[in-house]
């Protein structure tokens, strides 16, 4: 009896291995856990065609919005680990969602098979145009002296813009009133109107207003300068040693997906990013394409864990919760 069970297990294992090597044999679904037409969706639609060509099967995009990206993420976490559904995740779905509630609907570290980071989105500290500081040291000095009367805005409680300012405030050592909005647009409008003092946003969103001289850019909040704002020094360069609030977007498969499928999808991602026209379109959006060594499943697995560790203390200290 035991020999029969062992033989059946071996047959099933061999069959699964063959299926993994043959993958994909039909259409693959990329789940984007945000509404169609948004900035993340735009990136997905840039990458899907060249990735489809690399895989030899069409990748279709399914937008499943809701719960800050958690609804679509949960769908993939519970999907069959056969490679035919994968998730476009990011800092929100795999970091903030885990820290802002006592009972996350899924585990970012345990419920997915990491595939590859495909873009890194630099962030920037922006202020109202008449804010009395032009550099980060000047901003810090003013904020420490005037924090009781200052306000910062965000796209909403628990949003990336909110969490980035939480991390920055913690690093500086200030306690400033948070004003949540329903989206970055209204927050920027109020900052331009002088009703709030600063916002920590992604460069791709803030860039038109910076170039139009409607707001001030004080510091890049990423490890390296942005290609599209190369003259703006990083927080690290301006004395906030080691500060890094980079956002990232990456692909994930369900936990238990065979390694050959994971590696194949990672290669398709990297192949797409190596195309000159893809890089150009992404960089024109203010996004950074990671080098090959940061496009691997192993790198992404470590990144998810390190990001959770980095953000845990500031989020806890802020008292922010979605419960």
What do the PLM-derived regions correspond to, one by one?
Residues 5-15:
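Bacterial N-terminal signal peptides
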Residues 20-110, 149, 157, 173-202, ...:
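N-terminal (or domain-start) structured segment
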Residues 25-27, 259-323:
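An extracytoplasmic/periplasmic, membrane-proximal ligand-sensing/linker region
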Residues 78-84, 99-186, 235, 248-281:
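Hinge/capping helix and adjacent helix->loop/strand transition within the periplasmic-binding protein
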Residues 90-91, 129, 203-204, 222, ...:
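Short secondary-structure boundary segments
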Residues 107-117, 175-179, 197-198, 207-244, ...:
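Short beta-strand->loop
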